[in-house]
Amino acid sequence: MKIKLKKYHFLILFLIFLLNSCNINENNINQAFENEEPQTILANIPPDDPDGKYLYNPELTLNWYGYDKDGFIKGFKYRWCTLNSDNDTLWNDWSFIQSIDSDGNKIYDSNMKTFVFESPNERNFHIFEIAAIDDKGKADSSPAKLRFWTKKGPEAETELISSPSNETIVTESTNEFWKGLVFIFKDKNSKYAFKINNNQWSDYIYNDTIILTGKHFPSSGNYTIYFKSRNKYYMEDKSPLEFNVKIIKPLRTKELLLIDMTSDGIGLPGNPTDKETDNFYEMLLKDNNINFDIWDVNNEGFFPDRLKISGYKIIFIYSDHNFNTLENKFLYDDIQKLNEFLFTCGNIIISCKSINNLFYNNEQAYSFFYEIFQIEKNFNSIEILRDNQLKKINGYPTLEIEQNKIPFEWFGGLQNTQTYNPRAFNKSIYFLDSGNKINTTISLLNTKVYKAVLSTLPLYYFKYDEVKQLMKILFDNLK
């Protein structure tokens, strides 16, 4: 028994001796596996210059290098500060540069970058710091530092390359059609601010585009919008750009404006006088209990202005002659007026003998009706109406040619009927003999913003009672 105890004592003493001889403890274990900090070195061009012996351009390219004894460099973080006029320094937030991508591949040019340092004064002092980050995420706790001075940057200049009309209809917010008053500036690297009349300047926006809506303007009237820029050198434009604009906020208090764009005819079949068409549409509106005002483009000498049309919920344009005189065509600004009216939630009806007659050139017509009425650009197809009734979809009254206005036997039918092919949300209501309705003559467009009715076979030529029923349905839809 004593022999066995001696053996155990010997074994215990041997283990104690072995542990002491290895000298292993917890601190040594932690030290053996501790991650060492990476090191960062900045290139000596430009040299560290706290005293301002040299003045550099505000745009500088800096180079650096990082190494890690027990791993590899995953990236860098950098920041800098500029001494402002109050002798105070404000450090930028840290920014990061990756040296290794997600697949473990080295990213080239991660050891250099061109910076633009704010330099609004004749002499500007900066401190730049950069720290390497290793594969374990540990950063150099003593970042490499560079102190240097820059000279004043070039002056800022505010220049617009795109702006809205000097008179425009606005709404409180944008929609899928109306994008607001869009101002686009030339220099994409500058920041921009604005103010309206004598109000406060906005904060600088780091974008080459400023968009304003009706929320920026308390009421209709004339405004001056000022724009200024701050370029990448932190130079601020001392001569802000001025933009004068007449803002119209639509009231829509009136129901309908009837716009006569019919050139005067001689009263023969297919050649109505202006008075004949005027009487037809005025009676049509009165019998449907629609309150309306009249604007005769030929008598007035011009299309109604934005202020006039913005007071109405619906514009009804008719041009029922085979041709149009120059006075009864849309000028470019008239097209813009109609765009703004519709895109700010107005509704429109157009009845015409030919879409093209309303415009000075076909390209204007194609673009307007393709974008606004959502019809294909092949609306130049000319058909002959061989039946005295139009084909139609269910729910709409029959439309039959009025023989007193244009005898159906005249030239074997109603010639030169312009048809078109609706697209998107444009619903074909009346059409000629085609089963798939590609030769539409009357359609209704329903968007989330506005509604539009187009007829390329003048409503004037159809029997009055039938047109009256149709207009009641359309007016109920447009309200």
Predicted features by range, described:
Residues E176-W178, K188, S220-N222, F227-I314, ...:
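Aromatic-Pro/Gly-enriched surface loop or interdomain linker
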Residues L18-S21:
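C-terminal motif of bacterial Sec signal peptides marking the signal peptidase cleavage site
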Residues K2-F10:
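Bacterial N-terminal signal peptides that target proteins for export
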Residues F323-L414, N426-Y430, L470:
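A glycine-rich, often tryptophan-bearing local segment used as a flexible ligand/cofactor-contacting loop or short
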Residues N23-T253:
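Low-complexity, disordered linker/stalk regions enriched in Pro/Thr/Ser/Gly
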Residues Y420-T440:
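Short, Gly/Ser/Thr-enriched beta-strand-loop segments that form substrate-interacting elements
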Residues G270-Y366:
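Helical hinge/lid and interdomain linker segments adjacent to catalytic or ligand-binding clefts
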Residues N23-E26, F373-I375, G435-K479:
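Extracellular ligand-binding/catalytic regions of CAZymes and related secreted enzymes
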